Amino acid sequence: MSDCYTELEKAVIVLVENFYKYVSKYSLVKNKISKSSFREMLQKELNHMLSDTGNRKAADKLIQNLDANHDGRISFDEYWTLIGGITGPIAKLIHEQEQQSSS
């Protein structure tokens, strides 16, 4: 990855690459991840951030609710929405911890 990318651009590239890593590794359907493979990806890739039971339950609920077309597979758009939904509560927690440490 080029050093000319900003930290945010690098993060986006990692998210995109991670999706396609699991598509090619686990999915028979092109450009989609099964729900079970997505859960496995979360366990491997976000294990520390989802160690809180509440975060894990919230992630499971999002997975159940987001499969818009009910095909049991997660498209890239669904994945992107899921990642946003999962990171929202984590971002809030990080912000609260930063507030506490600065006071």
UniProtKB/Swiss-Prot annotation:
Residues 12-47, 54-89 form the EF-hand domain. Coiled coil: none annotated. One of its GO terms (molecular function) is RNA binding. Ca(2+) binds at D67, N69, D71, R73, E78. The keyword Cell cycle does not apply. Its main location: nucleus. One of its GO terms (biological process) is response to calcium ion. One of its GO terms (cellular component) is cytosol. PROSITE patterns: EF_HAND_1, EF_HAND_2, S100_CABP. Keywords: Calcium, Cytoplasm, Metal-binding, Nucleus, Repeat, Zinc. Calcium-binding protein. Binds one calcium ion per monomer. Can promote differentiation of adipocytes (in vitro). Overexpression in preadipocytes increases their proliferation, enhances adipogenesis and reduces insulin-stimulated glucose uptake. S100A16 proteins, but not other S100 proteins, have only one functional Ca(2+) binding site per monomer. Upon Ca(2+) binding, undergoes conformational changes leading to the exposure of hydrophobic patches which could be implicated in the Ca(2+) -dependent nuclear export. Binds Zn(2+). Ca(2+) and Zn(2+) do not bind to the same site. Does not bind Cu(2+). PANTHER family: PROTEIN S100-A16, S100 CALCIUM-BINDING PROTEIN. This is Protein S100-A16. It comes from Homo sapiens.
